[in-house]
């Protein structure tokens, strides 16, 4: 029996179980399947199956293309006790010739199935593009321009109207905010008295439609979290970190399964580093509680850590780093896999990381938003 002879409902059920990366091939294989895949009902069913599987895709930007990647935590151990940790490209997600538009992509933000890409285009100006990898569509953000080097961007979701918004915090005017509504294509500039600064070179992360940053009091230099609530269009109160920290010991914020926020803390004692990872029990714009996820003692110094991934079910964290080879002739890219009860492995990535991982890789959950 040919696939075309099967009942429509059965075909839909089979196709709705395909992985995200197979959408492009499915649409190009058969006109009927292409039409089916563009129905909202099919998209909702397909996305529901992807979400129910519990698997989370990682999106990586390489050479101005968007890839779906997978990480093999176990790898193959060689004679030198070094694991070959494979970072496998599952394939390119079709997104209307991004590589022909951008010269370089500086950052990527993910919120509710959409990606916000920030980079330089062919005339060297800085532009923003919003993409939905599920539909393979992109749209220019036309009314946000004239970026300064240290302006802060955030990507969020207004639950009251069901639309995505972009926030810009101006570096030159620290009390000035700009909010762009993607649905109405409207732009609003307002003043908001800020008594704190967003941590230098730290990007915010989107969780449940809101964005969280490290912030530091301008007088006391105390460090804490701050949240921008995109529904109420305002910053929330200061949220305490698990314990008092100095910001240079804090690693990047990380979102776990689109449900929790993780904080990494590094300390150095006697030539060795101690790493604590805390995960939220509860996280809202005006409330947070923490529990310790993992403590790692006596690990090498992670001076140049480029990013990390948390696998909460396996109780494992993967740290990405650079190491200079003997004689400082070249730099190799490696990863440390650490877990409970002293579990520690060094993994050889063999090929260079394409960009700093913490900036150009994010967890991705698809959305049917067009």
Swiss-Prot record:
Pfam families: F-box, FBA_1. Gene3D superfamilies: 1.20.1280.50. SUPFAM superfamilies: F-box domain. Residues 1-45 form the F-box domain. PANTHER family: BNACNNG10540D PROTEIN, F-BOX DOMAIN-CONTAINING PROTEIN. NCBIfam families: F_box_assoc_1. This is F-box protein At3g20690. It comes from Arabidopsis thaliana.
